[in-house]
UniProtKB/Swiss-Prot annotation:
Entry keyword annotation includes Ion transport: no
Pathway(s) the chain acts in: Amino-acid biosynthesis; L-methionine biosynthesis via salvage pathway; L-methionine from S-methyl-5-thio-alpha-D-ribose 1-phosphate: step 2/6
GO cellular component: cytoplasm
Protein name: Methylthioribulose-1-phosphate dehydratase
Record has Iron-sulfur as a keyword: no
EC number per UniProt: 4.2.1.109
Entry-linked SMART domains: Aldolase_II
Keywords: Amino-acid biosynthesis, Lyase, Metal-binding, Methionine biosynthesis, Zinc
Transmembrane domains' residue ranges: none
The species this protein was found in: Pseudomonas aeruginosa (strain UCBPP-PA14)
NCBIfam families: PRK09220.1, salvage_mtnB
Amino acid sequence: MNDNREQLTQQIIDAGRFLYGRGWSPATSSNYSARLDEQRALLTVSGKHKGQLGFDDVLATDLAGNSLEPGKKPSAETLLHTQLYAWNPAIGAVLHTHSVNATVLSRLVRGDRLVLQDYELQKAFAGVTTHEGQVEVPIFDNDQDIARLASRVQPWLEAHPYCPGYLIRGHGLYTWGARMSDALRQVEAFEFLFECELKVLSLSR
C-alpha cells in the first residue's frame, strides 16, 4: 500500500468512526470514498459496520464503479460516488450518511427540494459567503436501480455546479468536498440545518 493510499484509507476509517459516533451512520449503513487519482477512487466495501472499519474494508474502483480488487465487493451505491468524481475533478471525498434528521426531513418536505435560507451556518458550505442567499438541496426519490437514480442526479449537478449535496428520500444525505475534512464539515453543517428545519416544522404545526 503506497503512502497516499494508506493516508486516504485512514481518513475514511476515521470518518466512519466520527460519523458513527454522532449517530449519522448507524450499523452497516452509509458509504464513504476518497479520490485516489484521476482514474480511481477508494470506497468502503459493502456491508461493513462504519464504526469498525479497518484497512481491508476499503477497496479501489475505477470511475465507472467497477472493483479493481478481486474478491472485494463495493457498495451498491458506488456509482453515486464515482459519478461525482467524474463530474467535478476538484472533488476529493464523498460521504453518504443515514441520519435520523436527513431521513425524516426528506420524507416531510413536499416537492423535489429543500430550500435553506437565512441561516448563518450556510456559510459552512463551499462557495457560500452569506446567510442571505438560498441553498437548494434537491431530494430524489429512492430507487434500488442505482444507474437510474444516477441518471436523475446528473442533470441537477450539471445545472447547479455549486450544489453542496443532495438527499435521497427516506434514505440519507450525499455531500462532498475537496478533502475529507471539507466533506465532514459539510455533513456537520447539513445535520445542524436539518435539525433546525425539523424544529421549525414541529413548532409551526
